Amino acid sequence: MNELKHMACVPCAEAGSPLAADEIDRLRQELPDWEVVTEEGMVRLRRTFTFPDFGQALAFTNRVGELAEAEGHHPRLVTEWGRVTVEWWTHSAGGLHRNDFIMAARTGGLHEG
């Protein structure tokens, strides 16, 4: 069972340094549907979720937005017909932080129901 989604995020101001590669690899094992990518010089978690239509993709986007607002930690969201791409990373840490893995796990939970 994925315990990440039950963990608490820390405020971004306390985020500190980005995670080391070995810690990213360890946490990534708990999120097999997410990929680690580097874009614009920043390491991120990315996953594309699929839906049967735009309405369901938009509803999912809104649920992720509500989650992000509640935690004060915000992803990149790209909503298209039938799919939503979500990217998590921590600007203040300069890459991936444990918060990003926690939020990715919660995002996956929203999709799973």
Swiss-Prot record:
Family under the similarity heading: Belongs to the pterin-4-alpha-carbinolamine dehydratase family.
Protein name: Putative pterin-4-alpha-carbinolamine dehydratase
GO MF terms held by the record: 4-alpha-hydroxytetrahydrobiopterin dehydratase activity
Stored Pfam families: Pterin_4a (PF01329)
Catalytic activity as recorded in UniProt: (4aS,6R)-4a-hydroxy-L-erythro-5,6,7,8-tetrahydrobiopterin = (6R)-L-erythro-6,7-dihydrobiopterin + H2O
Lineage per the UniProt record: Bacteria, Pseudomonadati, Chlorobiota, Chlorobiia, Chlorobiales
GO biological process, one term: tetrahydrobiopterin biosynthetic process
Entry-linked SUPFAM superfamilies: PCD-like (SSF55248)
Lyase as UniProt keyword: yes
Keywords assigned by UniProt, alphabetized: Lyase
EC number: 4.2.1.96
Organism annotation: Chlorobium limicola (strain DSM 245 / NBRC 103803 / 6330)
InterPro entries listed in its UniProt record: PCD_sf, Pterin-4-alpha-carb_dehyd, Pterin_deHydtase
Domain of life, source organism: Bacteria
